[in-house]
UniProtKB/Swiss-Prot annotation:
Residues 498-716 are annotated as: NBD2. Belongs to the ClpA/ClpB family. This is Chaperone protein ClpB. It comes from Oceanobacillus iheyensis (strain DSM 14371 / CIP 107618 / JCM 11309 / KCTC 3954 / HTE831). Residues 80-144 are annotated as: Repeat 2. Residues 147-162 have a biased composition (Low complexity). Keywords: ATP-binding, Chaperone, Coiled coil, Cytoplasm, Nucleotide-binding, Repeat, Stress response. ATP 2 binds at G548, P549, T550, G551, V552, G553, K554, T555. Residues 163-344 are annotated as: NBD1. Residues 3-144 form the Clp R domain. The Clp repeat (R) domain probably functions as a substrate-discriminating domain, recruiting aggregated proteins to the ClpB hexamer and/or stabilizing bound proteins. The NBD2 domain is responsible for oligomerization, whereas the NBD1 domain stabilizes the hexamer probably in an ATP-dependent manner. The movement of the coiled-coil domain is essential for ClpB ability to rescue proteins from an aggregated state, probably by pulling apart large aggregated proteins, which are bound between the coiled-coils motifs of adjacent ClpB subunits in the functional hexamer. The gene is clpB.
Length: 809
């Protein structure tokens, strides 16, 4: 059977009739199942007609069961009976007679009545409803009668029946407003007033709402529909119907050439004749190219004449980008629409909107939303969710927080789960006892089952009562938790563990980075400021430039910070600036310009920060990059934002930016004196720092340096630091060996010798790594290959009499 012309509700009726057949255990779908489907659908004209005749689902089900009984589960695929097929064919014929281009629930009911001999007809007669009376009721609801049925819906009627094609393709916003299905529209009175002004013009009376996604363009059209229902519009717009047309629905199912144009022409003719329709086309840019196959004209060109003459009142809605990309290119279409800018609401307006919607979300989630939660949703979404717009993102926060709180409160208690498990076990044991014919045991288990079932029912009812009495509350903390889940930025209140970790951050960092207290303190203070909520919200958490000779821990401190913040040292965004030495390579940071290879891939820096807005950004060896790179970084350091090649603004306000550089390393090498008294060392460090800063000023522009929070000069490593660093490096080696079930330890003398061998003030800690490779790793690899070391063995390395490294027995 062909269901192409059947409306969504009509198709739902047929699906429900199949469900009824399965429920009753019947192998075929008969007229009685279609009747049950019509009543169960509940919203169509047929359901309303049957309800007005006093027919309820339970009554019809009872009568059907009485007439044909209940079977077992159907054993084969379910098919329509010949009578049911005839009803479907007659419904199409009824639609044709009434001049409707669609088949709705009312036509199915008319077909059912016309067939007149099936089980459905008997059910209706038994319930005291004559078929003729049922038919008259349907036609009355359709705004028609028997004498009008053959006239194919004349234009004189101002009812819904005069626009059958439009009704099948569009949704009536005024009906939704009347039924209270539209959310209240708050703070858009200026935009609605401007829309009314444009609609009241003689020609070109077509407003188009332009604004960013999520600012409330569709809400303006819904607000107009609500005002029409409340009679708060001028006389010119009284009794108008606002119909929202989805171009996808208009195009859907148009298989043959000319079908789309015919459908659209019918819609336009119906609108012209009805005279009381305001068409709302959301995503207006979909008009361009819609239905425009090879040689055919698209929807926008079909609508242009009517739009210009004022025969068609149309409200459009589209985003700024799509308006520019599609509508502005077609000047003839653009001049027929009057643009109305819908701006993003302010924080105060967003709070008003959320307060207006609060009742709807409280009723849906069965929770109470506090004033603090409303304010937090507006302020936190504005601050942390930067790629979307108010009020949409704030509403989404409230919605998800409500969902989260409700699900949390509806978690089944453990004692209830335990009772359900016990009941299942007893039921299985009883079935097993019956199978093995142990009837006494089965009787005893049946009593236990009954007892458990009663206990379960009582416990479940008590839990449900308790749930119904106490409404869960959506608090500021719940909103903050959702923001953290979305963005990865921790905005919830500090826990005791986190507070302790932040206060002891220096100690944690000192365990990884030896001998650089100034750098560690500066970074720790920046993180504490941010987490306590005292940092400047318009700038990054902190921006640092680490200077010093090679191998003193500049990059290591960035890794350690990432581990403290995210429990993973690889969680930082690392950009090796030596890759950006050529001028043309700088575009890779923000993405290639249009027309170049890699435009669709996005920037290497911007894309990573968009995905992880709360992160440590390490720009390693920054002096190796081309000077143009620093121009890109200016607005990142000052305003915490950067625009990528596609025009998207990337938010850097929740990042820690660390740049490392070897500028002035030669000065450090020349001016490092060992063995002076403490006072002299401090004075020496200050002199050396000032010289390095001078070198830095020569290498970088003042506007770049002026935007950096702190410039930190790392100390050269002292001999006393070496043992601690060797211990750290050996711990890393121990971790690698542990994976092979080997346990390594070194004697103090062995550690001391590595520290002495690897000490070089000019090269920092890296020579120690080479010393460990040469003396420890090479020795272990030889012993492993020789088979002298077995798995699960404790391996101790020390020195022999000649001072050589050996594996001790």
């Amino acid at each position: 059977m062909m269901f192409g012309r059947f409306t969504e509700r009509a198709q739902k009726v047929l699906a429900l009739s199949q469900e009824e057949a399965v429920r009753l255990g019947h192998n075929n779908i008969g007229t009685e199942h279609i009747l049950l489907g019509l009543v169960r659908e509940g919203e169509g004209i047929a359901a309303k007609a049957l309800q007005s005749l006093g027919l309820e689902v339970s009554k019809i089900q009872e009568e059907v069961e009485k007439l044909i009984g209940v079977g077992k589960q159907p054993t084969q695929s379910i098919h329509y009976t010949p009578r049911a097929k005839k009803v479907v064919e007659l419904s199409q014929d009824e639609a044709r007679k009434l001049g409707h281009s669609y088949v709705g629930t009312e036509h199915i009911l008319l077909g059912l009545i016309r067939e007149g001999e099936g089980v459905a007809a008997r059910v209706l007669n038994n319930l005291g409803v004559s078929l003729n009376k049922a038919r008259q009721q349907v036609l009355q609801l359709l705004g028609s009668n028997e004498s009008q049925a053959g006239r194919q819906g004349r234009s004189g009627q101002q009812s819904n029946a005069s626009t059958p094609t439009l009704d099948s393709l569009a949704r009536d916003l005024t009906v939704s407003a009347k039924e209270g299905k539209i959310d209240p529209v708050i703070g858009r009175s200026k935009e609605i007033e401007r829309v009314i002004q444009v609609l009241s013009r003689r020609t070109k009376n077509n407003p188009v709402l332009i604004g960013e996604p999520g600012v409330g363009k569709t809400a303006v059209a819904e607000g107009l529909a609500q005002q029409i229902i409340d009679n708060e519009v001028p006389e010119t717009l009284r009794d108008k119907r606002v119909m929202t047309l989805d171009m996808g629905t208009v195009v859907a199912g148009t298989k043959y050439r000319g079908e789309f144009e015919d459908r659209l022409k019918k819609v336009m003719e119906e609108i012209r004749q009805a005279g009381n329709i305001i068409l709302f086309i959301d995503e207006l840019h979909t008009l361009i190219g819609a239905g425009g196959a090879e040689g055919a004209i698209d929807a926008s060109n079909i609508l242009k004449p009517s739009l210009a003459r004022g025969e068609l009142q149309c409200i459009g809605a589209t985003t700024l980008d799509e308006y520019r990309k599609y509508i502005e290119k077609d000047a003839a279409l653009e001049r027929r629409f009057q643009p109305i800018q819908v701006d993003e609401p302010t924080l105060e307006e967003t709070i008003q909107i959320l307060n207006g919607l609060r009742d709807r979300y409280e009723a849906h989630h069965r929770v109470t939303i506090t004033d603090e939660a409303i304010e937090a949703a507006a302020s936190l979404s504005d601050r942390y969710i930067t790629d979307r717009f108010l009020p949409d993102k704030a509403i989404d926060l409230i919605d998800e927080a409500g969902s989260k709180v409700r699900l949390r409160s509806y978690t089944v208690p453990p004692n209830l789960k335990e009772l359900e498990q016990k009941l299942d076990e007893v039921r299985k044991e009883k079935d097993a006892a019956v199978q093995s014919q142990e009837f006494e045991k089965a009787a005893s288990l049946r009593d236990s089952e009954q007892r458990f079932r009663e206990e379960l029912e009582t416990t479940k009812n008590q839990w449900k009562e308790k749930q119904g009495q106490t409404d869960s509350e959506v608090t500021m903390e719940d909103i903050a938790a959702v923001v953290s889940t979305w963005t990865g930025v921790p905005v919830s209140k500090l826990t005791k563990d986190e507070t302790d970790r932040l206060l002891n951050m220096e100690k944690i960092l000192h365990d990884r980075v030896i001998g650089q207290s100034e750098a560690v303190n500066a970074v720790a203070k920046a993180i504490r400021r941010a987490r306590a909520g005292l940092k400047d919200p318009k700038r990054p958490i902190g921006s640092f430039i680490f200077l010093g000779p090679t191998g003193v821990g500049k990059t290591e401190l960035a890794r350690a910070l990432a581990e403290v913040m995210f429990a993973d040292e690889d969680a930082m965004i690392r950009i090796d600036m030596s890759e950006y030495m050529e001028r043309h390579a700088t575009s890779r940071l923000v993405g290639s310009p249009p027309g170049y290879v890699g435009y669709d891939e996005g920037g290497q820096l911007t894309e990573k920060v968009r995905r992880k807005p709360y992160s440590v950004v390490l720009l390693d060896e920054v002096e190796k990059a081309h000077p143009e790179v620093f121009n890109i970084l200016l607005q990142v350091l000052e305003d915490g934002r950067l625009t990528d090649s596609k025009g998207r603004v990337v938010d850097f306000r929740n990042t820690v930016i660390i740049m490392t550089s070897n500028v002035g390393a030669s000065e450090l090498k020349r001016n490092k004196y060992v063995g002076f008294a403490l006072d002299n060392e401090e004075k020496d460090y200050k002199d050396m720092k000032s010289k390095v800063i001078e070198e830095l000023k020569k290498a970088f522009r003042p506007e770049f340096l002026n935007r950096i929070d702190e410039t930190i000069v790392f100390h050269s490593l002292e001999k006393e630091h070496m043992k601690d660093i060797v211990t750290l490096m050996v711990q890393q080696l121990q971790k690698r060996l542990k994976e092979q079930d080997l346990h390594l330890s070194l004697t103090d003398k062995a550690i001391e010798k590595i520290a002495n061998e690897g000490f070089d003030p000019e090269y920092g800690a890296r020579p120690l790594r080479r010393s460990i490779q040469k003396n420890i790793e090479d020795l272990l690899s030889e012993e492993l290959l020789r088979g002298a070391i077995e798995k699960e063995q404790q391996v101790k390395i020390g020195l022999n009499n000649k001072g050589e490294f050996i594996v001790l027995p």
